[in-house]
Amino acid sequence: MARYLSRADLSRIAGKYIDQYYTRFGISKDAPEPIDPERLASAVLGLNVKMLPLCSDGSVLGLTVFQRCGFTVTLGDGTKLVEIFMPKDVVIDSALAADDCTGCRNFTIAHEAAHQILADLFPNDYGKAVKCRGHIAYRERNGQPSWEEWQANTLAAELLMPTFLVNAEIERAALCLPNGILYKSASDPNYERILEMAARIGVSWSAIRIRLQQMQVINGKPIHCHPLDVIRFGE
């Protein structure tokens, strides 16, 4: 079973690697910049990031490799591809190379990097998990929730959206939600600002929304119908 790690524990772990990333690329927290997960994975963690077709139905977003192994994927036309993966390989499904998949691609890279970070930091705990599941950890689009996957997702979010960076982006975007209410509507200027924040950081709308909720910038779920929409469309 994976070691118990709280959100605060995972935030501290992420902070150490972000510090290394900023030092490596000469970035100051006084003028924070978004974290490129591929650069973090390769330059800081020593991982090999690749893009290959992993499935024909979009169910497997990415995987990371702990021991040398073979991997076979059957494409939609029946073609079988066989790849040999090595330790520290991070493989992202090539369908995520599209421009409109930037958020999902970045989060998947960060998620797989998180698995490697946890395995490096806690080899005894995660070594047992590795033996149970084989040599590969997968990120599935609709995978079953587990403690280890929660940890990888939480660490990935902390790597991509550390509090200091999100706060800087809130200030840059002049985001103002005094009552914590957000309307998921073009009638709410805050919605457009949050979309711009997500694009700058390189994450999806869902990822930034969840992060802002965790930081209590947004209270509850966004409301889909803005009062101005009612006036315009007579709803």
PLM-predicted stretches and their roles:
Residues M1-E235:
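Active-site hotspot residues in diverse enzymes, especially metal/ion-binding acidic/histidine motifs
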